[in-house]
UniProtKB/Swiss-Prot annotation:
This is UPF0231 protein ESA_03214. Pfam families: UPF0231. Belongs to the UPF0231 family. It comes from the Bacteria. The lineage of its organism: Bacteria, Pseudomonadati, Pseudomonadota, Gammaproteobacteria, Enterobacterales. InterPro entries: UPF0231 (IPR008249).
Amino acid sequence: MDYEFLRDITGVVKVRLSMGHEALGHWFNEEVKGNLALLDEVEAAARDVKGSERQWQKTGHEYTLWLDGEEVMVRANQLEFSGDEMEEGMSYYDEESLSLCGVEDFLQVVQAYRDFLAQYG
């Protein structure tokens, strides 16, 4: 999973992730927005569920993050509809609306984000 951090013309830090992980970048950009307390909460939850069958979720304004001991999923809240409601030819999986990755990979991105903010924030 490749990622990069950018500062836009207004000084806001933006996160971009590789294809298939775009929703994770959107989660950082829409939900985190430099809120290190939210990252603290997510990291603590990752430690709590590690090695267990438990799951944890954090619902935001635009995206919801789920995690268990092995995997992290970020999904756009707008995807909360049943298959019957989908238009013909539409797929539930939209690369920019749903991302899955391993917990360790996710935590590496979180740490890199923190490091970027500390250096350039």
